[in-house]
């Protein structure tokens, strides 16, 4: 080694590396010590807070008012009189210099409970940030090559028009839900597989096929029994399969689209969304309320000891962020209360009624049936405060409020439940009809009507009341299926805090069956202690004959509903997915695709997200309105089967049908996402299956590309016969005598004048 490399001679490089590693170890130890100290402090204040929670509301908004006392001058001071402080302004504690006297006086004036509640709110924020960091770290450790999708990647992949629709969609957050990131991960895996070395035989080509879980593939092929080519899969026909030394004809190969998990999630969301179409003149925008949003707001209002609901309506994002644990306790309490109504209700395909049936969908009594109202009285007691007592008096109060220039928080106007009851187009017409009926029956004016003073027989039979209760029951019963309710709560509520490209702070409530679509399919296919009754098929690969139960009313409704939805899905070729997703383009040669760079390359991630068939919210609302009867049938069957079966407590060997993720043959690769489900049945795996019921497999098929043989077709005559006949014709023409050309005919003469004749001459 020359003197040029003298700095790297000896042990200098090793010592430098050791010093660097030791320094990092020391830094890590310091951070761990600070973290342990912080945890100890948090535990201490947590204990104090629990003691304080017994006497006071634990979730009041922390608002420290700084009161400036006006110092009296010497002329104003009166002996023996204590001057009273005057409030000048109220500011936040962060606005003060920590080294000033005002800050010290502020800290000294704070009460014990104010300090404890402030630290409790800080702890809530720390827990929220820690959970988000742990979720990201868990995904990266479980799948080191898993792609991290951001909103900019979604914008580049969808385009400006579809990205704008996605930004306005308050029911889904694509890049935050792990099961939707599997689309980009799947696309990348297929591209990596197609970069194998060039085969020796130039005639060999490959086809990479993608297919979903066996239960879904069998459900489409045997249950729906329709051709979904170019919708769910792409078929390649007339292929010559090569399997080692054997050659056999392969009729066709199917490659399924890798966005099926997203499609069924959007399909299930149509059951858990309620459109809000406001009346004109109320300055309200169109919105969509999900079942989880209605249930969480109902739980927050009905548990005042845990949640300050009016403070939540002032700033929903900040309140959910700072009081998420208290909101979850209220949500859990409400779900347990809803569970006791499970055995008392009967769900018909036209709506929700109480057994024995008292009313039908139109609110008219059923002959020979007497019983309680469709909605339990306890639920109606908590829904009545959301109802405006008299709309005429309300409008007069609003005019007075506008004249004063002040606007107070009203749960009847500012909450999702209140808006849906009072200002939705359809529910407002129902209330107006009820008011007119009361004025006719009791001979009173509309200003004298009090809706909150009605008995418990008029309001529960209205359509919007049953709709609210059915949606809340759907979210509650889906949550009760999960062993850990916090898993459900954390999945359906999402905080969006974005700074680019436009600032946005919002709370997204994902529909329950959109976040857990597997719960719907598993429940509707559940029958007699197992998902499907074993059919007559003797095939070991297909122990359940789905086609045999196509006449079952529950499955027939499910199949009809799925067929209607798949008609709205854009085609694979129309959306150009076959050009964006590797594995749908057909035959290829290795190394014919662009090189796949690392997962950290933004351009690669944007490329992997292209081709996703995004279905906007307007399309989903249109589908729900056009197929309302089919949606009601499926939802009624789902709620009815939940109350009759205990899926978690019933252990059966047939659970393996839905959880079977074993590759069917060698050479098939199973793509494991961060929601990978093990085949063993337990409560945790059931929750993971419900959130991500579709697993994808990749299989590479080797085929032979045969050269096209050109066929030369000849006449039935011999070739020399054609030449001989042609030569004989020429000789015959030469032997014919030549004839001179004839003179042209003379021009026609004009006709002579007619000569009259006599009869005799004639």
From Swiss-Prot:
Region Disordered, as annotated, extends over: 734-762
- Which protein is depicted? Uncharacterized protein ORF102
Which organism does this sequence originate in? Answer: Ostreid herpesvirus 1 (isolate France)
Regions of compositional bias (Pro residues) in chain numbering? 743-753
């Amino acid at each position: 080694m020359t003197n040029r490399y003298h700095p790297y001679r000896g042990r200098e490089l090793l010592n430098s590396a050791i010093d660097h590693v030791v320094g990092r170890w020391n830094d890590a130890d310091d951070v761990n010590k600070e973290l342990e100290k912080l945890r100890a402090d948090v535990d201490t204040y947590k204990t104090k807070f629990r003691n304080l929670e017994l006497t006071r509301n634990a979730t009041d908004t922390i608002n420290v008012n700084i009161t400036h006392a006006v110092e009296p001058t010497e002329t104003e001071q009166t002996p023996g009189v204590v001057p009273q402080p005057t409030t000048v302004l109220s500011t936040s504690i962060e606005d003060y210099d920590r080294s000033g006297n005002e800050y010290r006086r502020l800290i000294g004036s704070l009460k014990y409970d104010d300090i404890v509640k402030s630290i409790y709110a800080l702890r809530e924020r720390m827990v929220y940030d820690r959970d988000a960091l742990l979720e990201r770290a868990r995904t990266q450790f479980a799948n080191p090559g898993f792609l991290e999708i951001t909103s900019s990647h979604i914008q580049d992949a969808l385009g400006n028009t579809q990205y704008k629709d996605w930004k306005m969609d308050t029911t889904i957050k694509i890049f935050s839900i792990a099961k939707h990131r599997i689309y980009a991960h799947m696309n990348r895996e297929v591209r990596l597989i197609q970069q194998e070395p060039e085969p020796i035989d130039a005639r060999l080509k490959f086809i990479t096929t993608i297919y979903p879980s066996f239960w879904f593939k069998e459900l489409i092929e045997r249950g729906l029994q329709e051709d979904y080519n170019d919708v769910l899969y792409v078929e390649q026909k007339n292929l010559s399969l090569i399997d080692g030394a054997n050659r056999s004809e392969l009729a066709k190969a199917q490659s399924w689209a890798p966005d099926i998990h997203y499609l069924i999630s959007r399909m299930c969301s149509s059951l858990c969304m309620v459109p809000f179409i406001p009346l004109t003149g109320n300055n309200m925008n169109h919105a969509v309320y999900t079942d989880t949003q209605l249930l969480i707001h109902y739980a927050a209002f009905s548990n005042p000891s845990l949640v300050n609901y009016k403070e939540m309506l002032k700033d929903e994002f900040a309140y959910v962020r700072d009081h998420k644990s208290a909101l979850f306790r209220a949500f859990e309490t409400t779900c347990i209360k809803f569970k006791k109504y499970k055995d008392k209700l009967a769900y018909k395909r036209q709506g929700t009624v109480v057994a024995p049936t008292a009313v039908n969908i139109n609110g008219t009594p059923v002959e020979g049936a007497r019983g309680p109202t469709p909605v339990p009285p306890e639920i109606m007691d908590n829904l009545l405060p959301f109802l405006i007592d008299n709309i005429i008096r309300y409008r007069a109060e609003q005019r007075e409020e506008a004249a004063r220039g002040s606007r107070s928080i009203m749960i009847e106007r500012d909450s999702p439940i209140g808006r849906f009851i009072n200002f939705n187009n359809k529910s407002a017409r129902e209330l107006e009809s009820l008011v007119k009926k009361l004025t006719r029956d009791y001979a009173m004016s509309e200003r004298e009507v009090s809706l909150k003073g009605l008995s418990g027989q008029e309001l529960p039979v209205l359509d919007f009341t049953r709709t609210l209760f059915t949606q809340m029951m759907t979210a509650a019963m889906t949550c009760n299926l999960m062993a850990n309710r916090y898993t459900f709560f954390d999945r359906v509520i999402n905080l969006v805090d974005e700074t680019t490209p436009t600032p946005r702070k919002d709370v997204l409530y994902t529909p329950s069956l959109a976040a857990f679509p597997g719960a719907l399919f598993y429940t509707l296919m559940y029958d007699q202690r197992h998902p499907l009754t074993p059919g007559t098929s003797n095939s070991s690969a297909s122990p359940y004959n789905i086609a045999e139960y196509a006449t079952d009313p529950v499955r027939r409704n499910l199949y009809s509903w799925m067929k209607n939805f798949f008609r709205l899905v854009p085609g694979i070729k129309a959306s150009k997915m076959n050009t964006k997703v590797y594995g749908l383009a057909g035959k290829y040669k290795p190394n014919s695709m662009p090189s796949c760079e690392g997962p950290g390359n933004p351009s690669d991630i944007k490329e992997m997200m292209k081709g996703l068939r995004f279905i906007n919210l307007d399309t989903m609302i249109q589908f729900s309105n056009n197929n309302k009867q089919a949606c009601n049938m499926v939802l009624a069957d789902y709620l009815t089967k939940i109350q009759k079966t205990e899926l978690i407590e019933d252990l059966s060997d047939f659970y393996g049908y839905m959880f079977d993720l074993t590759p069917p043959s060698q050479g098939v690769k199973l793509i494991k996402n961060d929601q990978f489900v093990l085949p063993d049945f337990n409560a945790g795996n059931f929750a993971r299956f419900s959130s991500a019921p579709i697993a994808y497999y990749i299989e590479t098929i080797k085929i032979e590309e045969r050269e096209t043989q050109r066929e030369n077709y000849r006449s039935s005559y011999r070739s020399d016969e054609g030449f001989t006949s042609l030569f004989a014709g020429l000789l015959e023409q030469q032997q014919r005598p030549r004839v001179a050309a004839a003179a042209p005919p003379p021009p026609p003469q004009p006709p002579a004048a007619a000569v009259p004749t006599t009869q005799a001459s004639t």
